[in-house]
């Protein structure tokens, strides 16, 4: 269930609500983040296509995403993420404002401005790398599925990497070791929020003369 920052506004005084209004994310920030995430996803998707081309013996083939349907899916994922990230920030912004009010009930505009100016960079310092990692790994997992589905070359095996985990699902996959490639592609990464895992694939090579025919994002 999404965090409800609007519910916290009812606990604020006028000064705190004004502070939240001034600092919270809205459509413009969300749209900027959507564009950034789409760029991250697109680059990761294209790079993964190149990696998988190398895995089937066609090193040097570069991914170039021109498929509108796939680009649309990457954009939808980026838009969902941007809205979720915005909502989460606005919630914890409200929590921080209420905490600041408990610390200094008589705090004025300058007090709240300084408090949020100190808090926000710390929040984003750990959040942004996490956001980028999720965008990259989900795009790579999608590229793996599309590459082998469209090229019809899903023969081989895969292991989940990195080989350390705390999530029971990830631990289970790691314990299984190498699994058939088709099984891996049917169970793409991102098994839980902020999952760092992705399949490392060993695939059967295609004939050299077929390398120019590989689908690489068109």
Predicted regions and their residues:
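Acidic, glycine-rich two-metal-ion catalytic cores of nucleic acid-processing enzymes
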Residues: 119-211, 215
């Amino acid at each position: 269930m999404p965090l409800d920052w609007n519910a916290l506004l009812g606990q604020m005084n006028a000064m705190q609500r004004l502070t939240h209004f001034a600092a919270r994310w809205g459509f413009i920030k969300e749209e900027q983040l959507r564009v950034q995430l789409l760029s991250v996803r697109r680059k990761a998707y294209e790079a993964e296509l190149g990696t998988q081309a190398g895995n089937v013996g066609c090193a040097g083939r570069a991914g170039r995403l021109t498929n509108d349907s796939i680009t649309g899916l990457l954009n939808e994922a980026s838009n969902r993420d941007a809205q979720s990230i915005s909502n989460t920030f606005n919630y914890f912004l409200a929590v921080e404002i209420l905490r600041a009010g408990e610390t200094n009930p008589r705090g004025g505009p300058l007090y709240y401005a300084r408090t949020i100016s100190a808090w926000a960079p710390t929040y984003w310092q750990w959040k942004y790398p996490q956001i980028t990692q999720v965008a990259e790994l989900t795009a790579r997992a999608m590229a793996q599925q599309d590459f082998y589905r469209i090229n019809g070359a899903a023969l081989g095996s895969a292991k989940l990497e990195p080989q350390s985990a705390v999530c029971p699902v990830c631990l289970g996959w790691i314990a299984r070791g190498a699994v058939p490639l088709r099984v891996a592609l049917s169970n793409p990464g991102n098994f839980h929020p902020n999952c760092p895992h992705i399949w490392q694939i060993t695939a059967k090579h295609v004939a050299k003369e077929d390398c120019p025919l590989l689908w690489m994002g068109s």
